[in-house]
Amino acid sequence: MIKEGALGDAEAIFGMHIDTGTLTGRIALVSGPVLASTCFFEAKIEGVGGHAAGPHSTVDPILAASFSILALQQLISREADPLHSQVLSVTFIRGGSAFNVIPSYVEFGGTLRSLTTEGLHKLQQRLKEVIKGQAAVHRCKAFIDMKEKDHPFYPAVVNDDGLHQHVQKVGSLLLGPENVKRGKKVMAGEDFAFYQEKIPGFMLSIGIRNEELGSIHPPHSPYFFLDEDVLAIGAALHTALAELYLNEHKHSILDEAF
């Protein structure tokens, strides 16, 4: 959409995401970093396979992969600033299919997360160094794919401070100040961040929690159910956010137009 010029001359952008932790009729706001910069990775470690009865005649990729996965966890516990949230999760590993055969290769992969885009770039570099280093120590070769073609890297979602004040004011007018809550930072990612790289933006959480209706499960759960009362609230919020912003900034918009 950005490439095709959909943003046009927009000065600001607002987005919403449903939140089952917040009651229907409420919104939750966070200024600054709110959603993580994210990427995926897949690693292949090649050794020399052979019979498990003679491991000395093989180059065991399972051992190299095991040490790599353990060493990767130290990037978070020993290298990451604890005040700058980061996550490294290995989510799959595969290699071999027989009880008595050491395979010739092992594959594993997962995801990296950081509340700063710069932090993710550093984490990516260290991941490559650790996997290649551990593979070399165990006489193996490592190949790492950051999956950028199939799963593009996402920047962090960083909410604009000025727009935070605007959303807080509009939310208070529309829903009442008691229904505008402080939100939580989450290590999930959102492509809304690409818009924020171009213009100031703000993503808020809109509550859908309603225990009577069973609207309590997270969006990716098979038991997810939407409290549809939120549809009218969301539409009204989107309208009010845009209309009041345009009214407050009409001079700058008109100046650019003429």
Range-by-range predicted roles:
Residues 63-258:
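Metal-dependent amide/peptide-bond hydrolase catalytic core
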